[in-house]
Amino acid sequence: MQVLPPSSTGGPSRLFIMRPVATTLLMVAILLAGIIGYRALPVSALPEVDYPTIQVVTLYPGASPDVMTSAVTAPLERQFGQMSGLKQMSSQSSGGASVITLQFQLTLPLDVAEQEVQAAINAATNLLPSDLPNPPVYSKVNPADPPIMTLAVTSTAMPMTQVEDMVETRVAQKISQISGVGLVTLSGGQRPAVRVKLNAQAIAALGLTSETVRTAITGANVNSAKGSLDGPSRAVTLSANDQMQSAEEYRQLIIAYQNGAPIRLGDVATVEQGAENSWLGAWANKEQAIVMNVQRQPGANIISTADSIRQMLPQLTESLPKSVKVTVLSDRTTNIRASVNDTQFELMMAIALVVMIIYLFLRNIPATIIPGVAVPLSLIGTFAVMVFLDFSINNLTLMALTIATGFVVDDAIVVIENISRYIEKGEKPLAAALKGAGEIGFTIISLTFSLIAVLIPLLFMGDIVGRLFREFAITLAVAILISAVVSLTLTPMMCARMLSQESLRKQNRFSRASEKMFDRIIAAYGRGLAKVLNHPWLTLSVALSTLLLSVLLWVFIPKGFFPVQDNGIIQGTLQAPQSSSFANMAQRQRQVADVILQDPAVQSLTSFVGVDGTNPSLNSARLQINLKPLDERDDRVQKVIARLQTAVDKVPGVDLFLQPTQDLTIDTQVSRTQYQFTLQATSLDALSTWVPQLVEKLQQLPQLSDVSSDWQDQGLVAYVNVDRDSASRLGISMADVDNALYNAFGQRLISTIYTQANQYRVVLEHNTENTPGLAALDTIRLTSSDGGVVPLSSIAKIEQRFAPLSINHLDQFPVTTISFNMPDNYSLGDAVQAIMDTEKTLNLPVDITTQFQGSTLAFQSALGSTVWLIVAAVVAMYIVLGILYESFIHPITILSTLPTAGVGALLALLIAGSELDVIAIIGIILLIGIVKKNAIMMIDFALAAEREQGMSPRDAIYQACLLRFRPILMTTLAALLGALPLMLSTGVGAELRRPLGIGMVGGLVVSQVLTLFTTPVIYLLFDRLALWTKSRFARHEEEA
């Protein structure tokens, strides 16, 4: 039995080396747990980091923006403003619609927020208009979040009113019940109704008014309790023909008698089956349709929600007539799956490249198999922990695993290389494994914990960016930790069983040639290192220059927030002159649709015109452009957008604003372009003065493009200026005037038709076909106190004025949003700085405040914390290394490698034309953890040589550099090749992955070249500093 020296006991690895069966079974258990975890993990585009968001919609047909603001929005806002945990409240009040978006703190559960919203709505009920057709309705959805699925329902044989009725009752309700669905909206406005169009001349000739008609209809159509009869032996329920169901029944309704003869509704009005709101329309491509948009709840998994919808659709469509066709126009999960699949492929490529580089260096199949087992085992085992932490398989976690490929192989390489060295010296494999693993154990622990220390600050990042990268950091840390365990257990055990002197010495022609090549490289490195050590101050100046260059590059490199992704869907806003009518806007929309559908990259188009919960005014339209899959089109989304805008510019009288949909949605409202900047004031007058001035200035900036604001104060208003004294003499109140106008022009919902499946409305309005425009006001008649009929024109004058088409609030104060994009040659950082400089030149009054919103605000926050994040990572690593080495000096030597990584990463981003965004910054932080391993391996062996062999510091560090040159080169190339697939990524979602790969590859290349020379020099300089300090202390003690 061989007696091993104490130094060769194997340390923590001994138990696993000596018990191969137990070690193998333990690793099999990790593998099985990881496989089970992988199958159980949900799939998503990004980690679920949505703010809890609730949208409250109140519809009041016929109400002006001013009435909606004062009568509906303001009372609700006052109640919502008292809720705890509310982060931001924004509202939009337009003609007939109030939309309030409530964004809560990340820490507040959505269900709790829902309860608070419902309580606030209940408290505001008594403050809202008594004739509000429906109470406020809330949905757990972020309106700025694009729908996860868009469906178009069309029919060649049925009217759209019947189609919408069937979709609403048979399809939309069922989809709404699916877990994860936050809101199902039907765009197209074809809800069935009975429309009563009064003939103003006919009722005037008969001495009637619209109020007489309204009262007659509401009194004739009721549906209330009537009681029952309870006799000695039988109980009888009472019922009556109090409901009118069809247009024909309403035509026959008697509304008055004159000279004993009945006047029926059909005599004074056109009564027909129609749509509840005739100023709404939706189209799928060029065909009128009911468009169904499905939005998810904040925090819901998009893939599982879409899968549930897909599974239910065949069953739902079977319940519809054959002539009704349901088409899935867009499904965001298609691109998400493609992006995740591409990332998984890049992960497999990284593993293959890493194994290839191992074989290139070790030139031995058994030695290659060992890390070839360790790498996938470490990665697969990570899935088990991810399930326990409620993570998902998404682009960021897969990117973490791809990067981890280069990390986790480091530990195995270091162990194998050290054990192989002892076997080549003649040691038995078992003894070599015990000795090599024991010797390298501390290095593995140092590498692991110092690398994890770099990730710790990521866990404490605040707000949504911190939530976003928490899964990334923890996934990477778990993979690194499992890798360390595998490298100290399975790897030395396999080395003891699979490696031998014969296998290591067995060489073919390739092995001999590559060995000679490596020997020449090491010899050349040794000669270069000797020269460098003879000129330490020159080398130190190079190191300081890299630090200075890093700072300069950091200042001047273009900065961004989050890469703009190509998800194959473009959201658009079409803007026409502010006085445009529904019919005019619908015509313009069809012209634009024709142009867009001619583009070869466009697959389908949905568009919507009218005022509802998403569209604020009649002069705007919403579009969703669905592009062909990436492999079926030649251009990326930004080029398609530029091409479409150029084509639509030829359509007169419209402006088209386009932006690609993104997986990360921070905004709370649908804006015209990608980025937002707000002006908030205490009054609308202040905004009307300063918004046009600021917009004009911003439109002149070269750093901005597509600058526009949602401030529209030139909407035409017919102001009815009532002579109150004259009206009072006639016994006419302002309520009478409002009612008469509402009856005539408000599409007033005056009664409800109840059926077993749904409820439908009776809509009252004037027939204005023969009296268009302001002339229609001359037909209004009111009833005086003596029963006479009085023309409105006798007590009022009509004035044409201008007023806002919508009134927006942010946290209860008036606000306007300025939207903008950037040209290709400018970054978000350039745009933000230009806006801030322009704002200063305007000298805005103190009652106007400005703030960036959405992703621009998040960019500012992330940019402000980035430097502190990097400093925190460096400090955390210094603390860990100081504890491990029991030294204040050696951690500084190790950390001196960091500027070289920064220079390499920033130069690579600059050359590639990539911005320094959040993804790239994460790459730089990871580089901090990677590049210091070169110094750790050098310093560990140098300290051991000084301590055990009595070498001088210069000889020790020189020998350590030559001994560790091969594993340093091997591990660096492994990390580089692990990041290379990300850098070369071209598939779906490549925009998200590429900055990480570019930064890491650039940083690794530069740091590999420089740290091999700068680290030994800095090690010796600090060693001399330590000796000088000790001698100074010793001299002071002697003198004392």
Curated annotation (Swiss-Prot):
Domain of life per record: Bacteria
Keyword Ribonucleoprotein recorded: no
Cellular-component GO terms for this entry: plasma membrane
General function of this protein: The MdtABC tripartite complex confers resistance against novobiocin and deoxycholate.
Family designation: Belongs to the resistance-nodulation-cell division (RND) (TC 2.A.6) family. MdtB subfamily.
HAMAP family listed in its UniProt record: MdtB (MF_01423)
Designated name of the protein: Multidrug resistance protein MdtB
